[in-house]
Amino acid sequence: MFRKLNLYKCICLYKLKDKMETLPNEIARRGYLELILGCMFSGKTTYLVDTYNKLYSKFNIKVINYSGDTRYHSTMLSTHDKVMIPCIFTNTLSDVCEEKYLNNIDVILINEGQFFPDLYDTVCNLVEVHKKQVYVCGLDGDFKRAKFGSILDLIPIADNFIKLFAKCDSCGEKAIFSKRLTNENDQVVIGSTNYIPVCRHCYNN
């Protein structure tokens, strides 16, 4: 699994290291949305964990993960190489993002955003009404390269968009797609062993 995490990364628009560490007052007043997208094994959750580690000593953070994604731990958000941070598991974001739960929260990290049916409306409310700093990571397409949930709908309202890449499991080139290894046709089939990251050539051959 470690070889798959030899990542290619492309950060679009501008670098955010300083902003992530300080969250300037003007950002806090207006809200902020960052999207982290990519194929399987591209380091999306690792990026989210790194964001948490940069911010947790200065800000109150809520980490949310999809309840169906308990492959590595039942109460912690985990990367493929088992780096973990505390999180809340839920099927719908509205359950844990009501106003009464947000009073002391500065930053909200959402993992596997493509799975949440209420992602768009909830994130818009968090950023533009409650002025929270929200980071959402997820797949930019399913195994058929089709739109997955409503995560792509957030691009027009995002402050920043980051596209991550993996290493092709077949040839070693830059991977941009998730190829399913099993025969299920359902869009949602959770499990890292069911997929490999592949480049365009290997996806089509």
Features from the language model and the residues they span:
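Conserved P-loop NTPase "ATPase switch" module shared by AAA+ and STAND
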Residues: I105-F116
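Structural motif
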Residues: L35, V107-L109, Y135
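Short basic/glycine-enriched coil/helix segment immediately N-terminal to the Walker B
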Residues: C97-I105
